[in-house]
From Swiss-Prot:
Keyword Metal-binding: no
GO biological process: neuropeptide signaling pathway
Name this protein carries in UniProt: FMRFamide-5
Subcellular location as annotated: Secreted
Amino acid sequence: LSPTQDFMRF
């Protein structure tokens, strides 16, 4: 999972 996608999880 890319950093941006990981951020979008929240």
